[in-house]
Amino acid sequence: MAIWQGTSKRKSTGAKLRLVTKKHKREMGRPAVETHISAVIKRKIVRCRGANLKVKLEKTNYANVFDQVNKVCKKVLVTKVIDNKANKHYIRRNVITKGAIIETEMGKAKVTSRPGQDGVVNAVLLSE
């Protein structure tokens, strides 16, 4: 069944609303892509509104980490997810989202991009 992101057919009290318009295709949504750590890099290209393309990152083990002290950006290997404020179960499942703290070859880094929407993992190295 499709995900519909329009307004509800009912009020907060439970009474039915009189809808002015019917459901439109533009109000449809998709299930979220949860980016996992894996040796195989897998991307999904999806057509969006306006015939644009969106790259969704499904699996990866690399991240672009920026070192603020040395002003250097490197592509490094991601080993695991240390903390994720989005969902506590994402830590166990190694799901990368924006704001997640990941363990890399350079050290701990905080993810600044949205991998499920951008198709790449960008992160900033945390000073310890």
From Swiss-Prot:
The keyword Membrane does not apply. GO terms for biological process: translation. Keywords: Ribonucleoprotein, Ribosomal protein. GO terms for cellular component: ribonucleoprotein complex; ribosome. InterPro entries: Ribosomal_eS8, Ribosomal_protein_eS8_arc, Ribosomal_Se8/biogenesis_NSA2. Pfam families: Ribosomal_S8e. GO terms for molecular function: structural constituent of ribosome. It comes from the Archaea. The keyword Protein biosynthesis does not apply. HAMAP family: Ribosomal_eS8. Part of the 30S ribosomal subunit. Belongs to the eukaryotic ribosomal protein eS8 family. This is Small ribosomal subunit protein eS8. It comes from Methanococcus vannielii (strain ATCC 35089 / DSM 1224 / JCM 13029 / OCM 148 / SB). The gene is rps8e.
